[in-house]
Amino acid sequence: MRNNPLIPKSKLPNLGTTIFTQMSALAQKHQAINLSQGFPDFDGPRYLHERLAYHVAQGANQYAPMTGAQALREAIADKTAEIYGYRPDDVSDITVTAGATEALYAAITALVRAGDEVICFDPSYDSYAPAVALSGGVLKRIALTPPHFRVDWQAFSALLSERTRLVILNTPHNPTATVWRQADIEALWQAIGEREMYVLSDEVYEHICFAVEGHASVLAHPQLRERAVAVSSFGKTFHMTGWKIGYCVAPAAISAEIRKVHQYLTFCVNTPAQLALADMLRAAPEYYRALPDFYRKKRDVLVNALAQSRLKVLPCEGTYFLLIDYSAVSTLNDVEFCQWLTEEVGVAAIPLSVFCAAPFPHQLIRLCFAKQESTLLAAAERLCKL
């Protein structure tokens, strides 16, 4: 008889609990203002609540189609056509997923095989690397450096090889709050040309873009979209992160492979919530057009409130995150500083180094401004005392 528990050999031995979970738990423990994890402290549109209740009452409580409710896929196709001038096929090209993270995982799993190389840009969202590792891929990283975090396209081209199968981009970019320009999208296309590789474009903050020229999507590029997967998030757009509904748009052949993975991960997504979102997209198309101004005001509240502090605010072109240089305040590294900030000052933030594989020597932290104005001002008051 075995005396000790059977412990599996980990496929992800170097990973623990995500920094977002850690910092939110620390914030709760010390009753700190939580500007760490990226979720709003206000609710989404009342209309969504009403439509959800309506569809529940109408009996839409069984499995949805594996690819997503038809009404929602049609609404997504129409929205995409309006914004990017391209209408994906709502039957073959759009897949509704349990949040954007599932779409990212399913796409990586579908496209990456053992030994394939995948390129991403650091700092990068922490779900990319585990998905690549679980597929047996080899992650190649290109460092983006502050304060502007622009892509070095010569370095990118030099990293390409016959084994390169996928490049993962994220714009607007979490955590740096930068956005790609149309010139970047074109540079990507020129670099990959006719290579047999794909593009995974994480565009979950597509409607939270403050750049004058707007959001540059791969879906607006006729050549790139033929080999690209674009991922978006209703949770980010409608302040409903707990609904965990996202989607991906890709050509039919790529979507077919993504769906093979999706059907054995979650099979389908919450039916009444999908129908409520379809109603929302139809009834209020002006909603997402107003989102940049909505978050720009929140960004400016926090930036202006920190103007008299010793903290340096980096440019924010998109997302609902703000990078802060605290080098004038402390010599602690960013992980130590965030812990101290939470425990002693009462404001929780995210250290930027956790988004990087290589040592990150910069003293930068990330704050989330998807909060009520009173929350932002209270946090800024504490930070101004540093």
Feature-to-residue mapping (PLM):
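N-terminal small-domain helix-loop-helix segment of the aminotransferase-like
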Residues: 2-99, 106, 280-283
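Conserved core segment of the aminotransferase class I/II
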Residues: 3, 220, 225-296, 300, ...
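PLP-dependent enzyme catalytic core of the Aspartate aminotransferase-like
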Residues: 78, 157-158, 331, 340-349, ...
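Conserved PLP-anchoring active-site segment centered on the Schiff-base-forming lysine
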Residues: 110-132
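A short helix-loop-beta submotif of the ANL/AMP-binding
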Residues: 134-140
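A short helix->loop->beta-strand "cap" motif at the edges of active sites that frequently abuts
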Residues: 137, 194-197, 225-226
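Active-site phosphate-binding strand-loop segment of PLP-dependent enzymes
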Residues: 144-213
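Conserved glycine-rich beta-strand-loop-beta hairpin in the small C-terminal domain of fold type I
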Residues: 278, 294-303, 313-326, 360
